[in-house]
């Protein structure tokens, strides 16, 4: 990870936050723990609502209390996660083995491996060489550099069917770029925007390609099994990719307004320095060749993960095993590039992720999340709404349902069949309504624990939980609006009836 610096590559240090922003942040930090305690106690002690099991109520209390603390930032996020795990165990929400077992989840191993890979790419200078080449060749301005990173995400989604694998490839490149620009983690608006755009681009690009994530394919199967609609690869691409690209363009423009960096980087003078740094790397070294070979093997295994079972008679190597294999190769004497002490693994993030998954999984397994969504649907009175209103409400409910469902797969499994049943009850086209909702499934972008991609980018330290929450909500609103408008325009041109 880049070291904190006091200057940018070609200009003054980033502007400090204004007094109003500082005051708000200070108040939230100061009273966050009391607010979290109040939220927890209010939910824990309230009379048990109809349809919600006692364990579900406890899980809801723990989840919302932890969420409040994560956003407030009163105490370190890993400490909040540890408190959440303790609370789950002491309240009997889940068993101790379940609560503590999240530290052994495959995503934790994936994150450890990703940090090893990142450290290897940084040490070998391969990531620096690629980043410098990319910026000096195509990134004439900081804005163009950001646009190129977004474009790369939209290209590799066709070849690497894993959101986490794509993030694991992009994060080291972003780190090196920001190191070149001397962007200070936590202070640089340019750094915040680059990392947050990485989160948004990964999610939005995935929504446009059916094979971008397993959740998309599960949704397609539900639509076929329960609604009789056959959605092919090109059907999904034609419907989803234009919406994804439009949403990304709007999100990109909004991000430039939210995180202004014009006074932070004097890029006109910095380009010559970047070109000089690129030339100074000289010929490709042995370490870079090793890193390139490991990188190529990793990308190949990730990109072919969905086809290996067909090719090798049921045998396949998952993205998690692939990542650990790559990490082992990086650490292997003679073959690799690193010693263990050189691998910059953020163990505090591992604890944070474990607690986040424990709280989120408890909410799902106890029925708390499903109860919240069901109550919201009933409370809004969807059954009495017009057709247009039903579509808009369902799309936005699906969009923001990731706030309580931490797993895209679980979210898909619960939402899509429910939406199909709702459409059939109301006499609407279940294929169109379910497909529209399916395009929201990848928008897990508002908080770090909502996806593995988020945790990988968040681990860089460039943005806070609150900053991701703000930008994520804006992006979800943009995406929901674009999908809603498209249902009544673009979908009709493609032949989908309401």
Task: Give residue spans per PLM region.
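Alpha-helical transmembrane segments
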Residues: 106-116, 160-168, 236-252, 432-442
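C-terminal transmembrane helix pair
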Residues: 180-186, 241, 354-359, 363, ...
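Hydrophobic transmembrane alpha-helices of multi-pass small-molecule transporters
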Residues: 1-110, 235-374, 474-476, 480, ...
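Membrane-core helix-loop-helix motifs of multi-pass transport proteins
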Residues: 181-261, 453-487
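Transmembrane alpha-helix interface/packing and boundary motifs in multi-pass membrane proteins
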Residues: 68-76, 152-162, 199-210, 396-408, ...
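Hydrophobic core positions of alpha-helical segments in small-molecule transporters
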Residues: 83, 148-149, 197, 239, ...
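Alpha-helix capping and helix-loop boundary segments enriched in small/acidic/polar residues
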Residues: 52-56, 74, 103-104, 121, ...
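Membrane-embedded alpha-helical segments and adjacent helix-loop junctions characteristic
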Residues: 48, 65, 78-185, 347-349, ...
């Amino acid at each position: 990870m880049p070291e904190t610096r006091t200057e940018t590559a070609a200009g003054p240090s980033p502007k400090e936050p204004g007094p109003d922003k500082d005051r708000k942040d200070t108040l939230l930090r100061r009273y966050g723990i009391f607010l979290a305690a109040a939220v927890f106690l209010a939910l824990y002690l309230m009379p048990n609502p109809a349809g919600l099991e006692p364990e579900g109520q406890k899980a809801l209390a723990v989840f919302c209390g932890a969420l409040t603390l994560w956003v407030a930032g009163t105490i370190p996020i890993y400490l909040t996660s540890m408190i959440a795990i303790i609370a789950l165990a002491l309240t009997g929400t889940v068993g101790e083995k379940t609560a503590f077992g999240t530290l052994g989840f495959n995503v934790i191993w994936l994150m450890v491996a990703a940090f090893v890979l990142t450290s290897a790419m940084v040490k070998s200078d391969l990531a620096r060489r690629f980043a410098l080449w990319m910026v000096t060749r195509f990134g004439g301005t900081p804005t163009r550099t950001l646009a190129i990173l977004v474009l790369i995400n939209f290209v590799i989604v066709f070849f690497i069917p894993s959101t986490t694998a794509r993030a694991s490839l992009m994060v080291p490149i972003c780190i090196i770029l920001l190191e070149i620009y001397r962007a200070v983690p936590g202070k640089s608006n340019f750094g915040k925007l680059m990392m947050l755009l990485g989160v948004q681009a990964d999610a939005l690009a995935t929504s446009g390609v059916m094979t971008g994530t397993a959740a998309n394919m599960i949704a397609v199967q539900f639509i076929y099994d329960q609604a009789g609609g056959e959605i092919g690869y090109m059907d999904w691409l034609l419907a989803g990719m234009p919406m994804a690209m439009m949403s990304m363009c709007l999100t990109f423009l909004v991000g430039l307004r939210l995180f202004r960096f014009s006074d932070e980087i004097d890029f006109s003078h910095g380009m010559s320095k970047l070109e000089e740094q690129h030339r100074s790397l000289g010929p490709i070294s042995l370490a870079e060749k090793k890193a390139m070979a490991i990188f190529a093997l990793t990308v190949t295994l990730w990109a072919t993960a969905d086809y290996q079972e067909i090719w090798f008679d049921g045998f396949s190597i998952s993205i998690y095993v692939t990542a650990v294999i790559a990490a082992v190769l990086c650490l292997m004497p003679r073959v690799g590039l690193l010693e263990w002490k050189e691998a910059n693994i953020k163990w505090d993030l591992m604890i944070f992720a474990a607690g986040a998954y424990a709280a989120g999984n408890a909410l799902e397994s106890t029925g708390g999340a499903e109860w919240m969504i069901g109550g919201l649907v009933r409370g809004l009175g969807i059954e009495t709404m017009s057709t247009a209103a039903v579509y808009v409400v369902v799309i936005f409910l699906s969009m923001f349902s990731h706030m309580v469902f931490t797993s895209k797969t679980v979210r898909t499994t619960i939402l899509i069949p429910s939406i199909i049943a709702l459409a059939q009850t109301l006499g609407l086209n279940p294929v169109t309504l379910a497909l529209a909702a399916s395009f929201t499934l990848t928008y897990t972008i508002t908080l770090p624990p909502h996806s593995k991609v988020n945790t990988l980018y968040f681990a860089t330290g460039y943005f806070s939980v609150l900053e991701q929450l703000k930008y994520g909500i804006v992006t979800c609103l943009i995406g929901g609006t674009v999908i809603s408008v498209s249902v009544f325009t673009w979908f009709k041109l493609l032949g989908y009836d309401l």
